[in-house]
Amino acid sequence: MAVPNELKYSKEHEWVKVEGNVAIIGITEYAQSELGDIVFVELPETDDEINEGDTFGSVESVKTVSELYAPISGKVVEVNEELEDSPEFVNESPYEKAWMVKVEISDESQIEALLTAEKYSEMIGE
């Protein structure tokens, strides 16, 4: 199971890629495999404020609905609108096509507190 080294991870199975002062957030390959076929993705609006630990959307699969938890706080600067019409991207390409939101980072220390790829791999038993 892919756990890219350049990303950071939350215990709730979100990944974070930092580009300057923006964090790109999605769900991990492990999370999508546990959920099964994704049929719907609900995301926040651009300019919404999200807070670390709070829900910022949900992913619906044929099995269940799973909340998305913000790994960091900040302002949503972009939403992946392709997921509205193509939720299957979450299964097919969790780290590329299926990024969910881009967030302006409000607290750098929250990035440092996330798991490394090695720690996340240990957590999921890889």
Swiss-Prot record:
Quaternary structure and interacting proteins, as annotated: The glycine cleavage system is composed of four proteins: P, T, L and H.
Gene Ontology CC entries for this record: cytosol; glycine cleavage complex
The species this protein was found in: Staphylococcus aureus (strain NCTC 8325 / PS 47)
Matching Pfam families: GCV_H (PF01597)
Family according to the record: Belongs to the GcvH family.
Keywords, in A-Z order: Lipoyl
Cofactor names: (R)-lipoate
Descriptive protein name: Glycine cleavage system H protein
Annotated Lipoyl-binding domain residues: 22-104
Residues with the N6-lipoyllysine modification: K63
Gene that encodes the chain: gcvH
Lineage: Bacteria, Bacillati, Bacillota, Bacilli, Bacillales
Co-factor note (free text): Binds 1 lipoyl cofactor covalently.
Biological function: The glycine cleavage system catalyzes the degradation of glycine. The H protein shuttles the methylamine group of glycine from the P protein to the T protein.
Domain of life: Bacteria
UniProt keyword Magnesium, yes or no: no
